[in-house]
């Protein structure tokens, strides 16, 4: 106690009493705290019982220079076909033939579980429910050929033990009813997996197209169909052809079988065989006319027909293995045998010839044109990946392809055109290497590819060409939360196809022929691309400079300016830019 004088005095009490009082106060405090926590807990449970916590996981993510799209468990899994899934990926759309196409890179090169797809029907008949994810690569690195502008890597779900039987059927109601059916069997027992597929598709429809060519001739100077007049006194020649098919159908049989063996947990081997047979008749009505200035010179009508017939056999073998924590090795081998026919049955009659007094039989132009080819492809590819550390990786590999094709074009009767026969052979070898560095928030990928190509065309005008080139590539990426962006550069080359080089003449219609150009040079491409994404938003922009750009043109025939020739030529250079936001 404190007195008024400020002195201090204490009451007499024992140490034991003090401790007893403290313990009592402590116990009371603990009990009060427990009761308070219990009441709070009850109150929180009541409040949380009415609360649902939701999280949103992005369907797309950036990974190693590509965009990985989850398919399983997302809205994309509800799409009717794999084609619809691929067409809805960032930067992709569906072209007029119903196949996925990149807005900037063109037709993609597609892989399923790292196996290259040789025939697109394999993708068409892949059940959507079996797709786990798809990686879209809009700036391919050194591993891929210089003619590849986009890559799609499809990963499927793992097979479970036991037998799985899947039957898929589909119907399309349009001008006609189309349908497709396939039966898919998979059996997994221990380390072995066996699988097979058998399918049939019938597609029916109508189509119509029109071709118009305009040629300008002034004296001995000829223009072209670009609209560039040869002078004020030029004569204008116009030729037009309309093809109208009222009923086209496609019978498509396809099949596959294979087996995979897991040698160990980290090593797998497998072999797969697949094939198809396609028969597609396309009868159509052909109407065409020719004009000189404003005067109609002739009208031609015809009941013509296209007949396409293709078959293919493909065998693939592979080995995939991991060695320790750093090495990964993939080896693939392919053999392809294929046959293609593109028959054309022509039965045309000219009003001009009838007006000149000739008989209907003499005025009729009737013949059969049958281009066909048989091809063989051998291919092998090996790729090794080495993890230097958690920030650096190294990839290297090599591939070789041998292609042989024998083509011939026959006219019946023989006097209706010039028959051709040619044999093409191509040896294509490549080695590639790529280094990746991750220094967050940035990552860098640098690649270099070397290609050697030896191609030979044996025909009435033999051609032999060799190409040896280096193709560098660079990719710089940045990641910050849900926002990612990348800048890339790639050098590549587009070589002319044998169709573009072959100087044999092919009949297109009454006023149009096709002939190749043996003097074509390869096109050199330099592409810069910027890509950005935030969540599910995607932006893509590119600029491409092309030296010796290959393009098709229509030139007038010297003896008949109303008849045009579709051919190909090199333009000194061109550039283009494109962008996509979605």
Set out the residue ranges of the language-model regions.
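Short strand-turn segments of transmembrane beta-barrel domains in outer membranes
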Residues: 72-73, 161-185
């Amino acid at each position: 106690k404190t007195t008024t004088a400020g002195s201090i005095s204490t009451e007499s009490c024992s140490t034991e009493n003090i401790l007893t009082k403290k313990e009592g106060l402590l116990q009371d405090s603990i009990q009060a705290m427990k009761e308070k926590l219990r009441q709070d807990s009850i109150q929180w449970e009541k409040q949380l019982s009415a609360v649902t916590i939701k999280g949103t996981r992005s369907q797309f993510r950036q990974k190693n220079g590509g965009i990985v799209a989850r398919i399983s468990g997302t809205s994309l899994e509800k799409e009717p076909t794999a084609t619809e899934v691929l067409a809805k990926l960032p930067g992709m759309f569906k072209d007029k033939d119903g196949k996925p196409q990149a807005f900037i890179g063109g037709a993609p090169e597609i892989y399923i579980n790292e196996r290259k797809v040789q025939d697109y029907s394999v993708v068409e008949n892949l059940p959507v429910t079996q797709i786990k994810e798809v990686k879209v690569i809009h700036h391919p690195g050194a591993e891929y050929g210089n003619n590849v502008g986009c890559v799609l890597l499809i990963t499927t779900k793992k097979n479970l033990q036991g037998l799985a039987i899947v039957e898929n059927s589909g119907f399309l109601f349009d001008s006609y009813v189309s349908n497709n059916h396939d039966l898919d069997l998979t059996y997994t027992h221990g380390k072995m997996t066996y699988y097979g597929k058998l399918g049939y598709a019938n597609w029916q429809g109508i189509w119509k197209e029109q071709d118009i060519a305009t040629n300008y001739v002034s004296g001995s100077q000829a223009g072209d169909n670009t609209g560039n007049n040869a002078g004020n006194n030029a004569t204008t020649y116009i030729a037009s052809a309309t093809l109208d098919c009222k009923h086209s159908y496609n019978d498509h049989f396809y099949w596959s079988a294979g087996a995979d063996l897991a040698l160990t947990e980290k090593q797998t081997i497998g072999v797969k065989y697949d094939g198809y047979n396609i028969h597609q008749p396309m009868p159509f009505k052909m109407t065409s006319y020719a004009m000189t200035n404003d005067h109609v010179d002739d009208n031609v009508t015809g009941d013509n027909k296209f007949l396409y017939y293709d078959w293919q056999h493909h065998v693939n073998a592979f080995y995939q293995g991991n060695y320790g924590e750093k090495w990964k090795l993939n080896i693939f081998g392919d053999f392809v045998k294929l046959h293609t026919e593109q028959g054309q049955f022509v039965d045309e009659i000219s009003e001009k010839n009838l007006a000149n007094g000739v008989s209907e039989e003499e005025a009729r132009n009737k013949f059969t044109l049958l281009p066909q080819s048989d091809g063989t492809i051998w291919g092998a590819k090996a790729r090794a990946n080495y993890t230097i550390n958690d920030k650096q990786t190294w990839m290297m590999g090599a591939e070789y392809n041998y292609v042989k094709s024998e083509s011939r074009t026959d006219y019946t009767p023989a006097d209706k055109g010039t028959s051709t026969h040619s044999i093409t052979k191509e040896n294509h070898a490549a080695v590639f290497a790529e280094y990746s560095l991750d220094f967050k928030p940035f990552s860098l990928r640098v690649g270099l590819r070397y290609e050697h190509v030896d191609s030979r065309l044996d025909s009435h005008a033999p051609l032999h060409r060799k190409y040896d080139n280096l193709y560098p590539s660079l990719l710089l990426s940045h990641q910050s939360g849900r926002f990612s962006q990348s800048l890339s550069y790639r050098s590549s080359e587009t070589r002319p196809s044998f169709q573009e080089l072959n100087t044999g003449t092919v009949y297109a219609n009454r006023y149009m022929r096709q002939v190749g150009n043996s003097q074509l040079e390869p096109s050199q491409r330099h592409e810069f691309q910027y890509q950005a994404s935030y969540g599910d938003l995607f932006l893509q922009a590119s600029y491409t400079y092309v030296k010796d750009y290959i393009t098709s043109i229509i030139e007038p025939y010297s003896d008949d300016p109303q008849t045009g020739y579709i051919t190909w030529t090199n333009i000194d250079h061109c550039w283009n830019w494109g962008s996509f936001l979605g």
